[in-house]
Amino acid sequence: AEKPNDPLFTRKFIPAKLSDNPYLLHSGEYEMMLLSLPELERKRLLEGDWDIAEGAAFSEFNRFHHVVDPFDVPHGWYRVRAADYGYTSPSCVLWGALDHDDNLWIYRELYIKRQNGDELGIKIREMEENDPPPIVSVLDGASWNRTGTGLTVAELINKSGCMFIPADKNRIRGKLELHKRLRVDPESGSNIKIFSNCVNLIRELTSIPLSKTNSEDVDTKASDHAYDALRYMC
């Protein structure tokens, strides 16, 4: 029986690619037309990939190539950690691992508001209790700014035992490094993989737009907390 608050209609997205339609695929002409389209339209109509928003900064991001199901990260892989701090806006902490081929695997995220530096540091330690220590741990530069006589946000976080160092401030260089990692090689694939439980990072990578005033950067007014943490890591 229907309940008062039940939706009248539901939708389910079923992705479809040209390869799913043998008639159109074998004609050849339709495929040539799709290949000539701009990148975003081509990805949608030829590859059935509707993840990327119009004007998104990372149009090469693709769930098939870049998102994987979680697994137990081997202890022999080097661990890395990066964080972008916010209080009224979210803080994001990302945990990654580098395998022996320098592929970067993002396996955990923390996305949380209204945490002081010491509170965030304690939460980080709790979440990584069973992890090997990271070889690199970086935190946004603004967290090191001193606004009064007390400890900075970075000092409060480090006091908990996390031990961050300042992240590279160069926004353009970090974005370019991420583009390199997202690039898909026909034989080896991409050298960045993101666990499917990192939902906020995936959301931002599919939607964050380019800046309207600087085409080399993203729009800093958009939700970019997980993106910034990833940029620091790259």
List PLM regions with ranges.
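Short beta-strand scaffold segments in enzyme catalytic cores
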Residues: P90-A97, R231
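Mg2+-dependent endonuclease catalytic cores in nucleic-acid-processing enzymes, primarily RNase H-like
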Residues: H100-D219
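Acidic, Mg2+-coordinating catalytic module of metal-dependent nucleases/exonucleases
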Residues: D217-C234
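ASCE P-loop NTPase helicase motor core
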Residues: A1-Y23, E29-M32
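A residue-level signal for conserved active-site and pocket-lining positions in enzyme catalytic cores
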Residues: A16, L46, V93, S137, ...
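ATPase catalytic-site recognition across NTP-hydrolyzing enzymes
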Residues: N21-Y85
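Hydrophobic/aromatic beta-strand patches that form the interior of the parallel beta-sheet core
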Residues: K12-A16, R81, V138
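Short acidic/glycine-rich loop or secondary-structure boundary segments that cap or lie
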Residues: L24, E54-A56, P70, S89-V93, ...
